[in-house]
């Protein structure tokens, strides 16, 4: 009987410890919409231009700059040597880290190798441009299409279109 209680105690401690660790690393640095804001006018990439596109490539990625992103380290490290694909001097990397029909995304500063943002989950991918700081999430898929403005290393939720 005492051994059974001891086993139950260890299991309880393991579960609680796992929940605490999981809650620390599952948080996202991406802003969730505070409330549904319908798009009065659909944002277009040309309305969010960058002044120039950085010509260099990622020399190395600093995984310590965002510890939450370590769960996607293989995909992030594979981006070494990549050129800008978004917002003038950023590289947006995607990985299937959140389920069968879900992708998780991170934004890396190509100049510094720092992981600026991590944890945006989408079911319909993202649409980005090298010369624009607009991010369009879920252009396909079941979830609403959301629009974000990524400027000065900050992400601002703009609006969304229901499906």
What are these regions (language model features)?
Residues 118-163:
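Short aromatic loop motif centered on NTY/YTY
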Residues 9-21:
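Hydrophobic membrane-insertion alpha-helices, especially the h-region
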Residues 1-7:
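Positively charged n-region of N-terminal signal peptides that target proteins for export
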Residues 97-100, 141-142:
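Short glycine/acidic-enriched loop and turn motifs that connect beta-strands
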Residues 20-82:
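Terminal domain-start segments
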Residues 53-67, 106-118, 146-160:
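Surface-exposed loop/turn elements that mediate protein-protein interactions on large endomembrane-trafficking
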Residues 79-85, 127-129:
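Structural signature of eukaryotic scaffold interfaces centered on beta-propeller domains
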Residues 89-92, 133-135:
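Acidic/hydrophobic-patterned starts of short beta strands in beta-sheet-rich repeat architectures
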